[in-house]
């Protein structure tokens, strides 16, 4: 099941990078101000 482990690590790394960029740059989507 090494493939599953490598896949998990790959997804985790991409997830961390994605969130790092996402939170570094404010999302350009209209927010609802309640």
Curated annotation (Swiss-Prot):
Report the InterPro entries cross-referenced here. Answer: PSII_PsbT, PSII_PsbT_sf
Keyword Transmembrane on entry: yes
Alphabetized SUPFAM superfamilies for the sequence: Photosystem II reaction center protein T, PsbT (SSF161029)
User: What are the GO BP annotations of this UniProt entry?
Assistant: photosynthesis
Tell me, what's a Pfam family for it? PsbT
- Binding partners and assembly: PSII is composed of 1 copy each of membrane proteins PsbA, PsbB, PsbC, PsbD, PsbE, PsbF, PsbH, PsbI, PsbJ, PsbK, PsbL, PsbM, PsbT, PsbY, PsbZ, Psb30/Ycf12, at least 3 peripheral proteins of the oxygen-evolving complex and a large number of cofactors. It forms dimeric complexes.
> In its UniProt entry, what is this protein called?
Photosystem II reaction center protein T
Which species does the entry assign this protein to?
Glycine max
């Amino acid at each position: 099941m090494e493939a599953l482990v490598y896949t998990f690590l790959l997804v985790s790394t991409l997830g961390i990078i994605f969130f790092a960029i996402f939170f570094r740059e404010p999302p350009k989507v209209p927010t609802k101000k309640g």
